[in-house]
Swiss-Prot record:
Motif ('KMSKS' region): 594-598
Obligatory cofactor(s): Zn(2+)
Positions of Zn(2+) binding: C887, C890, C907, C910
GO cellular component labels: cytosol
Example GO BP: isoleucyl-tRNA aminoacylation
Organism: Thermotoga petrophila (strain ATCC BAA-488 / DSM 13995 / JCM 10881 / RKU-1)
Domain notes: IleRS has two distinct active sites: one for aminoacylation and one for editing. The misactivated valine is translocated from the active site to the editing site, which sterically excludes the correctly activated isoleucine. The single editing site contains two valyl binding pockets, one specific for each substrate (Val-AMP or Val-tRNA(Ile)).
InterPro entries according to UniProt: aa-tRNA-synth_I_CS, aa-tRNA-synth_Ia, Anticodon_Ile_BEm, Ile-tRNA-ligase, Ile-tRNA-ligase_type1, Ile-tRNA_ligase, M/V/L/I-tRNA-synth_anticd-bd, Rossmann-like_a/b/a_fold
Family statement: Belongs to the class-I aminoacyl-tRNA synthetase family. IleS type 1 subfamily.
Binding site for ATP: K597
Name the UniProt record assigns to this protein: Isoleucine--tRNA ligase
Gene: ileS
Pfam families (alphabetical): Anticodon_1, tRNA-synt_1, zf-FPG_IleRS
Amino acid sequence: MDYKNTLNLPKTSFPMKANLVNKEKVFLEEWEKMDLYNYVLEQRKGKPLFVLHDGPPYANGHIHIGTALNKILKDIVVKYKTMRGYRAPYVPGWDTHGLPIEHRVSQELGEKIKEMSPAEIRKKCEEFALRFVDIQREEFKRLGVRGDWENPYITLKPDYEVKILDVFKTLVEEGNVYRSLKPIYWCPRCRTALAEAEIEYHDHKSPSIYVKFRSKEDPNFFIVIWTTTPWTLPANVGIALHPDYEYSVVKVGEEKWVIATDLLDAFSKETGIDCSNVVEKIKGKDLEGKEFVHPIFDDKTSRVILADYVSLETGTGCVHIAPGHGEEDYIYGHVQYGLPIVSPVDEEGRFTEEAGKYKGMFIEDANEVIIEDLKKKGILVHASSITHSYPHCWRCKGPVIFRATEQWFISVDHNNLRQKVLEEIDKVKWIPEWGRNRIRSMVEERPDWCISRQRVWGTPIPAVKCKECGEVTLDPKVIEHFMKIVEKEGTNAWFEKEVEELIPEDFVCPKCGKRSFEKMLDTLDVWIDSGASFEYITTKREDHPFPLDMYLEGSDQHRGWFHSSIFLAVAKRGSAPYKEVLTHGFIKDEQGRKMSKSLGNVVDPMEVVEKYGAEILRLWLASSDYFNDIKISMRIVEQQTEVYRKIRNTFRFLLGNLEGFDPELDRVPYEKLLTIDRWALGRLQEIIKRATEYYDSYEFSKVYNLVVKYCTTELSSLYLDVVKDRLYVEAKDSIYRRSAQTVMHEILIALMKILAPIMTFTMEEVYSHLHEKDRKYKTVQAEYWPEYKEEFIDRELMEDFEKLLSIREDVLKALEEKRQQDVIGHSLDAEVVLVPKNDTIKALLEKYRDILEELFIVSKVSLSDASGELKGELVEVTVKHAEGEKCQRCWKYTTEISTSEDFPGVCPRCLAVLKGERK
């Protein structure tokens, strides 16, 4: 007789195949229709706020795997906090000014750009930026990221530009902004100043030369310097020695050379010059003020100064000083000693007339010519080359130079700003903790902030220059007047209007009292644009109070957005703009290499999405320890499809076996649950507790590992396998089946919620297949986090089960051995004989005697004192084929097979079920 129709086999419309690529688009449409973002916020009305403030990506291209990683991480945090009961708004932003966009636009325009006005170029830049805002918006939405996509903040919008100027005005009012001729990073290809945050370090091959400077007093007395920038020698005005280092005066032929004693051996080894004849030892301070002949221009001199930054790591301990081309040179040479600033290099990196015969040469091309001239003069001691880490432009990737120009700066020490920032850093929670020391050291060491750029695409610095006396003025009254214009017309007005319209009617030159001005055309560093986002978001959005709860970006932002934001916020508001800062690493390829088009190892997130679905990308991210650098390749991503399949199958099994289960009417109270079910419910509480702890510490890879292990080893291979018999065989409404279903229902709901922040599409699909009584909201994203219930953990039961599951492992090994020997096929063919190792284990097995067959999925379990075949830690195990006949309904063996006419060939349990006698 075929009993198949008498079994409670799983039934569900939840498909086995995910078809993610198409299914995700369906959910995106549904979320759009329900206005998901506002709907979820509405469900948390009146709840405490948690605000993750979005660091704006740059709108100059499609999203890449790094920006995808960042947005998904933020989405996981926001969705988790929402489920924990917070009102968690998320307003995306875009950074839209600056050189990279202007660079791309100039490439597109080609020669035409030379005929265009600044206002026309700016219009093209705006169109370009907004085009990519729209492109990136759709790409981020495709990743399943929930946000206020219709109302983002965009740094080029007039209402945002006003806030940039407002923050800037505060700095001007407080006296932190000044103008000065100083050496700053300069990109000769992009023809603009650069800030520290716009610098990248790459290996670069440079000349390495030793040059001797002749004393003006004694033609045979020389100081030997070492430099890797021969092109800066025309700008030389001094030589720096350390005041306290010991220097040796070495006899070389008829000449005496000064070299730091500790560097003599290294110098000799590199140059091949014998330095053993030391005639005198002196301190650096002994030579202070002495004058030496300029290495390039014989009519100029070079003065010895003292500087404690001089090191004994490389070179000679004697440093050539050019205040026009170096930060320390400027501080020690110009500020402390009053040496002149010579900077004979124009904006394109070519020498000016001041450089004499080198005029018109590009600086790097001039290196060889200068070295040859030094050789002819007989003062080149040694020349070679060196590969070292050197600053490069973030945009064009070319090497930069230090060049002295008139620029605007923010003084980081005026009004004790640096110290206040350091104090605020210590009040912030940094995750990982090392972020605190990283940003602290950067703030402690940073120079004043060069904030002016010689480009048109940016927020203009509203400074004016008096035509009568040449005074350049940056006045809060002018900034405020301009802000009112910007509110209505945007910052393009600065480039379109006459200067008289841009300044207050009563404004005159503070130096000469005249009212005849011209506009200055410098623009602000874009790090001020993005750094002022706290001011915009907290004044424009009621649901974004200051300070904001969290900033979450890559670890490079310790010197970027985290850095600029805290300086501007402390200046404007007196405190850090964030309470918590979370950083992630960078994405590398499978071999740990940086992604680059030249290596052909770039993984396009949208390609992954179109091939596998956004869910797989989200799952890959959750599997990664993102605090460190993360590896990715299409192969690595593909591995997640198998993990995804296992998780999906777990949900399908749960849904299939809960078909017809009414969570209100069919639930079994805890005290009536069967033993195995009570254990499983206790384990679920432990899973909920650990998952919550991991989410709270943002350790999503631990959530992933916990859930994957739970689904595969505890559910599929253990609990769900064990209860299949009860689910399929017992009466539909019996306590045996309902007890298992009650716990499976708890598992389904909790697991769905735990995975919802990560697997946002699939858990929405699971939610749509729940019993209507389980769907309180239109979306799983509005649900509350599963509650950890201590009362569901029976400590004694949990401890007992640790031992029982250890015994089960031994039983499974013994079963497998007999399967290999063809003694049994399915485990239900077996009878297991257990020999406990001691009385404690014997008592344990006696205590749980009634559930052992179910737990081991065998037909019979008996205890014995005889020796067993497999020696385990707690028991010895013998497996033999079960006696009797196989029940045609449940496949268990019994010696009491039914001969009933109505239900022949079944065991007593199945007979009772079929007769309706087993409840």
